[in-house]
Amino acid sequence: MKINAVFEGGGVKGISLAGAVRAAEMQGVQFEQVAGTSSGAIIATLLAANYSGLDIKRIVENTPFSSFLKRSFIFNLKVISPALRLLVKKGLYSGEALEYWVSRLLEAKGVRTFGDLPDCKLRIVASDITNGRLLVLPEDIKIYGMDPKKLSVARAVRMSASIPYFFDPVVVRYTKLHSSLSIKNKDKPQLQQAHIVDGGL
């Protein structure tokens, strides 16, 4: 039986979805189009890259998720508290280790960008907290002047899994035309930035 599925988040607990996927496949279920948010985006992404439920279960069981909790040594100094990092970076941890982990798993399947996946195979939900907008990736990345097919899948997963104040938000910089009353400065492009976080908000 072929189905479409949406995987919700739930932090590390959401990773337990790997067992549910394995159980479903043992009952003959095949996942066609998949979508996910937060930790559910990780499961959906691995399925879209043709990892089986058993593969995902083994990956989860053998991954020390504490390895994602890394930050620059300067923010580990006693004179510089994690609170300062939170103030400066908007998160306790960067999220780079998570993105790298996902990218390595995807590269093993020949996947880097959404252009490497069949159309409509994967959708990832994230939140633009700067503009108060829910994003469905890759399509909505067009809002920022980017090509959906060129968007890194691992970066999209990091966006969706960036739990506010825990992981740094992913900053997207883009150019926006600004209309001015002055004819000389009319439609002058301005550099903007948006902070993208966990799609479960």
Where in the sequence are the language-model features?
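Catalytic nucleophile loop
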Residues: 41
